[in-house]
Amino acid sequence: MALDPAVVGRGYPPSAVYEVGRAKIAEFAAALADPDPAYRDPAAAAALGHPDVIAPPTFAIVLTLEAANVVLDDPDVALDYSRVVHGEQRFVHHRPIRAGDRLVAATTIDSVRSVAGNDLLTTRVELTTEDGEAVCTATSMLVARGTA
Protein backbone atom coordinates (compact mmCIF):
# COMPACT_ATOMS: atom_id res chain seq x y z
CA MET A 1 0.00 0.00 0.00
CA ALA A 2 1.40 3.41 -0.99
CA LEU A 3 2.12 5.94 1.72
CA ASP A 4 -0.38 8.77 2.05
CA PRO A 5 1.17 12.15 1.18
CA ALA A 6 -1.28 13.76 3.62
CA VAL A 7 1.16 12.90 6.42
CA VAL A 8 3.75 15.35 5.06
CA GLY A 9 4.28 18.15 7.57
CA ARG A 10 3.11 16.06 10.50
CA GLY A 11 5.07 16.89 13.63
CA TYR A 12 5.34 14.84 16.79
CA PRO A 13 5.76 15.92 20.41
CA PRO A 14 9.33 16.35 21.61
CA SER A 15 11.07 13.38 23.19
CA ALA A 16 11.92 13.09 26.84
CA VAL A 17 15.13 14.86 27.87
CA TYR A 18 18.30 12.87 27.18
CA GLU A 19 21.29 13.82 29.30
CA VAL A 20 24.53 13.30 27.41
CA GLY A 21 27.15 11.65 29.62
CA ARG A 22 30.90 11.38 29.28
CA ALA A 23 30.74 7.58 29.52
CA LYS A 24 28.20 7.35 26.68
CA ILE A 25 30.37 9.56 24.47
CA ALA A 26 33.48 7.49 25.28
CA GLU A 27 31.61 4.23 24.54
CA PHE A 28 30.39 5.57 21.21
CA ALA A 29 33.87 6.80 20.24
CA ALA A 30 35.32 3.41 21.20
CA ALA A 31 32.75 1.63 19.02
CA LEU A 32 33.94 3.80 16.13
CA ALA A 33 37.59 3.12 17.04
CA ASP A 34 38.06 6.89 17.03
CA PRO A 35 41.03 7.88 19.21
CA ASP A 36 40.29 11.64 19.27
CA PRO A 37 41.09 12.72 22.85
CA ALA A 38 38.38 15.42 22.75
CA TYR A 39 35.86 12.57 23.02
CA ARG A 40 37.34 11.31 26.31
CA ASP A 41 39.53 13.95 27.95
CA PRO A 42 37.99 17.19 29.28
CA ALA A 43 41.40 18.92 29.08
CA ALA A 44 41.75 18.00 25.39
CA ALA A 45 38.24 19.30 24.72
CA ALA A 46 38.97 22.49 26.69
CA ALA A 47 42.09 23.06 24.58
CA LEU A 48 39.76 23.16 21.57
CA GLY A 49 37.46 25.66 23.29
CA HIS A 50 34.77 23.29 24.54
CA PRO A 51 33.41 23.31 28.11
CA ASP A 52 33.52 19.50 28.35
CA VAL A 53 34.18 16.47 26.16
CA ILE A 54 32.43 16.52 22.81
CA ALA A 55 30.73 13.69 20.96
CA PRO A 56 31.67 12.33 17.54
CA PRO A 57 29.40 13.89 14.90
CA THR A 58 27.46 10.67 14.35
CA PHE A 59 26.61 10.40 18.08
CA ALA A 60 23.42 12.26 17.16
CA ILE A 61 22.04 8.98 15.80
CA VAL A 62 21.68 7.74 19.40
CA LEU A 63 18.89 10.26 19.92
CA THR A 64 17.54 10.84 16.43
CA LEU A 65 16.95 7.20 15.55
CA GLU A 66 14.85 6.67 18.66
CA ALA A 67 12.99 9.94 18.08
CA ALA A 68 12.12 9.00 14.49
CA ASN A 69 10.50 5.78 15.69
CA VAL A 70 7.34 7.78 16.43
CA VAL A 71 6.77 7.78 12.67
CA LEU A 72 6.96 3.99 12.54
CA ASP A 73 4.43 3.77 15.37
CA ASP A 74 1.98 6.21 13.74
CA PRO A 75 -1.01 4.21 12.41
CA ASP A 76 -1.80 6.98 9.90
CA VAL A 77 1.59 6.47 8.26
CA ALA A 78 0.97 2.70 8.08
CA LEU A 79 4.57 1.89 7.22
CA ASP A 80 5.25 -1.83 6.83
CA TYR A 81 8.62 -1.99 8.57
CA SER A 82 9.34 -5.45 7.14
CA ARG A 83 9.68 -3.75 3.73
CA VAL A 84 11.85 -0.82 4.88
CA VAL A 85 15.52 -0.14 4.27
CA HIS A 86 17.46 2.93 5.36
CA GLY A 87 18.17 4.98 2.27
CA GLU A 88 19.98 8.08 3.47
CA GLN A 89 21.15 9.92 6.59
CA ARG A 90 22.45 13.49 6.98
CA PHE A 91 23.45 15.56 9.99
CA VAL A 92 23.79 19.33 10.07
CA HIS A 93 25.50 20.30 13.31
CA HIS A 94 24.81 23.75 14.69
CA ARG A 95 27.34 23.08 17.45
CA PRO A 96 29.02 19.98 18.89
CA ILE A 97 27.08 17.72 21.23
CA ARG A 98 28.78 17.97 24.63
CA ALA A 99 28.79 16.00 27.86
CA GLY A 100 26.23 17.55 30.16
CA ASP A 101 23.88 18.58 27.35
CA ARG A 102 20.23 17.94 28.10
CA LEU A 103 18.71 17.35 24.68
CA VAL A 104 15.24 16.88 23.28
CA ALA A 105 14.33 15.66 19.80
CA ALA A 106 11.33 16.75 17.74
CA THR A 107 10.42 14.77 14.61
CA THR A 108 8.62 15.99 11.48
CA ILE A 109 7.72 14.15 8.26
CA ASP A 110 9.23 16.27 5.49
CA SER A 111 8.25 14.35 2.37
CA VAL A 112 6.65 11.26 0.90
CA ARG A 113 7.18 10.34 -2.73
CA SER A 114 7.05 7.28 -4.95
CA VAL A 115 9.94 6.25 -7.19
CA ALA A 116 10.18 3.06 -9.27
CA GLY A 117 7.52 1.25 -7.26
CA ASN A 118 8.98 2.26 -3.89
CA ASP A 119 7.84 4.84 -1.36
CA LEU A 120 10.44 7.25 0.01
CA LEU A 121 9.68 8.78 3.42
CA THR A 122 11.92 11.60 4.63
CA THR A 123 11.94 12.66 8.27
CA ARG A 124 13.69 15.52 10.02
CA VAL A 125 14.65 15.44 13.67
CA GLU A 126 15.61 18.70 15.36
CA LEU A 127 17.88 18.21 18.36
CA THR A 128 17.85 21.12 20.77
CA THR A 129 18.81 21.71 24.35
CA GLU A 130 15.87 21.68 26.73
CA ASP A 131 16.19 25.50 26.63
CA GLY A 132 15.70 25.53 22.85
CA GLU A 133 19.28 26.01 21.59
CA ALA A 134 19.68 24.32 18.19
CA VAL A 135 22.29 21.54 18.29
CA CYS A 136 21.75 19.28 15.27
CA THR A 137 19.30 18.67 12.44
CA ALA A 138 19.14 15.06 11.27
CA THR A 139 17.43 14.10 8.04
CA SER A 140 16.82 10.49 7.11
CA MET A 141 15.10 8.76 4.25
CA LEU A 142 13.43 5.38 4.55
CA VAL A 143 12.66 3.32 1.47
CA ALA A 144 9.52 1.16 1.66
CA ARG A 145 10.21 -1.39 -1.07
CA GLY A 146 7.49 -2.37 -3.51
CA THR A 147 4.68 -0.40 -1.90
CA ALA A 148 3.95 2.33 -4.43
Each language-model region and where it sits:
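HotDog/MaoC-like acyl-thioester-processing domains
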Residues: 1-3, 88, 92-148
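Hot-dog-fold acyl-thioester-processing enzymes
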Residues: 1-86
